[in-house]
Amino acid sequence: MTNNIKLIQKIHESKYQITFVSSGGGTNAISSLLKVPGASNTVLESYIPYSKKSMDLFLNRKPDHYCSLNTSLSMAANAYKKCLQIDNEYKKKYFIGISVTASLATTYTKIGDHKFYISVQTESFTKSVEC
């Protein structure tokens, strides 16, 4: 955990500011960022649209699949747009929208594999990873 704390401290010391949105597994990342002093320098907002209706509202549409690459990309794009709404255009090169959507262990019989998608949106690029 010490390495994670050091990494998060470096993030908080940077010029970057983020809006983080997570649904399903991955919500602990928000908690981890907020636990380390300096979070107010980094985190502009965080969202946890956990229910389907909440996700529909966050995306302004109902996605084809809630845990998918397309949904993760849309979440990150909307998170980036939230950054722009909060602060002025001067800092936009330092804004990052980050999203995580995951389908992991649950209390009912799971249909399909465990999976997650992480996406990052900035002014100049979009990146994602899936597993």
Name every feature range the model reports, one short phrase each.
Residues 1-131:
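Short alpha-helical segments enriched in small residues
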